Amino acid sequence: MSEPRNVRYVTIRAVLFDFSGTLFRLEHDSLAAHAGLMRALTAPVGLADGLDIDPAQWERRDLDPDAHRDMHLAVLAKAGAKDPAKFYADLCSPPFWQPYPDTAQALGTELPTAVVSNIAWDISAVFARHGVENRVDEFVLSYQEGFVKPDPKIFRIACDRLGVHPTEALMIGDSAEADGGAAAVGCQVEIVEPLPTGSRPEALLQVLRKHI
């Protein structure tokens, strides 16, 4: 059977990963009672229902560490958190972030790899805690770059630093709205579900097998 016409096959030469809900998930016994609030606070874009706060300010939280802290403390206080400051510190603490079972293997493809995240703190410590920081070539973080996903600029930055054209990169994330922005610059995009780590054993590897 002949190949379909006008189909372009591109070799993937680099992989871009989202952080929260893709490679790692905020999970800790002390946070179990606040699962709904955790989902709202770690959503990559948008303002979750029930968070009484200025949407414009919330959208900019991942561009400035001080604003990130202030906004989260305000939300936590309104949600009735007993100690908002400690709660916020836990959200930014490596021990509270757990890797998915296939994270280490997914980061070991030998292709150039970047983590592209809407975040306002240095997540490299999370990777270091689990011994995989050396498997990431570039951390492209919104608060350092001045752009948040789905802005195409942040994906271009990641591809430029890895030395590949966007059409040669695969973006893997958990949000079609945020991570799907990579398609605007030509990246291939795959979305995984941000399930609890114990419920998603090899979604990353399944995606990688489709493309690499």
Predicted regions and their residues:
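Asp-based, Mg2+/Mn2+-dependent phosphohydrolase catalytic module
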Residues: M1-V15, R25, K82, A104-G108, ...
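N-terminal helical cap/lid subdomain that shapes the substrate entry/recognition surface
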Residues: E3-D102, G108, W121-S124
